[in-house]
């Protein structure tokens, strides 16, 4: 199976870790992802069914539209990727229209445009829910036609829902396995990116996720794999899991003083391990 890239640029995307995640995911008929993001794990695994969730309604509405109207969407989206749209004033006008519109097709077209023409592929909202990523000033933003087509075809096996991780866990079935890619625990007090979908993911949220993962394995017999930074705090949270350290290819900037690769944890909660805890 050829490795497949997501069509969205995405902070914390799992493309570089797909092989490690595949290796540690137990076999099941359904993969459940409460934090689907750009979908790299979905795109590079082969389960019969997928339940893919995110708290960002723009993302989920986009995925559902691409699933049901792929040709119409791709045809229209391609028309946005022209040199005259690669200007700051055009970008800011489209961003303004996006924040005022409730039309599903327009919002999905603008979402892809802003992902590719905006700064660094960020997805960020202000406290009022307005998308606020600045213009990216890229020479020629790439139109991901093949990636969109692949996603749309594979999406026929998937159900996309806008839901919290707790709601998504509740919908997992006995033949499911759950993979969680939450907003990562900070390496330092200044390193956290908390404006995704207008909500921060706190240390209390990290603890609650670890708790529900352990309970789901122990009480419902469903295995849960979580990825996160390898820190003293995350090791404490995942002490009831099998811990595997992987080397991430992505880099984390530390106060602008150079970039450092970081270790990541893959924590696997299984019914067997949880019953021994």
Curated annotation (Swiss-Prot):
Keywords: DNA replication, DNA-binding, Methyltransferase, S-adenosyl-L-methionine, Transferase. Disruption phenotype: Essential, it cannot be deleted. Its EC number is 2.1.1.72. It comes from the Bacteria. GO terms for molecular function: S-adenosyl-L-methionine binding; sequence-specific DNA binding; site-specific DNA-methyltransferase (adenine-specific) activity. GO terms for biological process: DNA replication; DNA restriction-modification system; methylation; mismatch repair. InterPro entries: Ade_MeTrfase_dom_2, DNA_methylase_N6_adenine_CS, M_m6A_EcoRV, MeTrfase_D12, SAM-dependent_MTases_sf. S-adenosyl-L-methionine binds at residues 10, 14, 54, 181. May be involved in methyl-directed DNA mismatch repair, initiation of chromosome replication and gene expression. NCBIfam families: dam. PANTHER family: DNA ADENINE METHYLASE. This is DNA adenine methylase. It comes from Vibrio cholerae serotype O1 (strain ATCC 39541 / Classical Ogawa 395 / O395). The gene is dam.
């Amino acid at each position: 199976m050829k490795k497949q890239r997501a069509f969205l640029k995405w902070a914390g995307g799992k493309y570089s870790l797909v092989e490690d995640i595949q290796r540690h995911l137990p076999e099941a008929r359904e993969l459940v992802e409460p934090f689907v993001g750009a979908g790299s794990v979905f795109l590079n695994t082969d389960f019969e069914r997928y339940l893919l969730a995110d708290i960002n309604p723009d993302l989920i509405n986009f995925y559902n539209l691409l699933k049901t109207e792929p040709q119409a969407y791709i045809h229209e989206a391609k028309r946005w990727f022209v040199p005259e749209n690669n200007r700051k004033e055009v970008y800011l006008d489209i961003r303004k229209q996006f924040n005022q519109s409730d039309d599903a097709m327009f919002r999905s077209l603008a979402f892809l445009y802003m992902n590719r023409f905006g700064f660094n592929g960020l997805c960020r909202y202000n406290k009022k829910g307005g998308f606020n990523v600045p213009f990216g000033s890229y020479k020629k933003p790439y139109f991901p036609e093949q990636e969109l087509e692949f996603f749309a075809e594979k999406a026929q096996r998937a159900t996309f829902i806008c839901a919290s991780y707790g709601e998504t866990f509740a919908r997992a079935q006995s033949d499911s396995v759950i993979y969680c890619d939450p907003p990562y625990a900070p390496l330092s007090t200044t390193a956290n990116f908390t404006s995704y979908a207008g909500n921060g993911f706190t240390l209390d949220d990290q603890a609650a996720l670890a708790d529900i993962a352990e309970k789901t394995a122990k009480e419902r017999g469903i295995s849960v794999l979580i990825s996160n930074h390898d820190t003293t705090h995350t090791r404490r949270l995942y002490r009831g899991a099998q811990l595997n350290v992987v080397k991430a290819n992505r880099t984390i900037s530390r106060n602008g003083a150079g970039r450092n690769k970081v270790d990541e944890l893959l924590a696997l909660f299984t019914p067997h391990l949880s019953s021994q805890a």
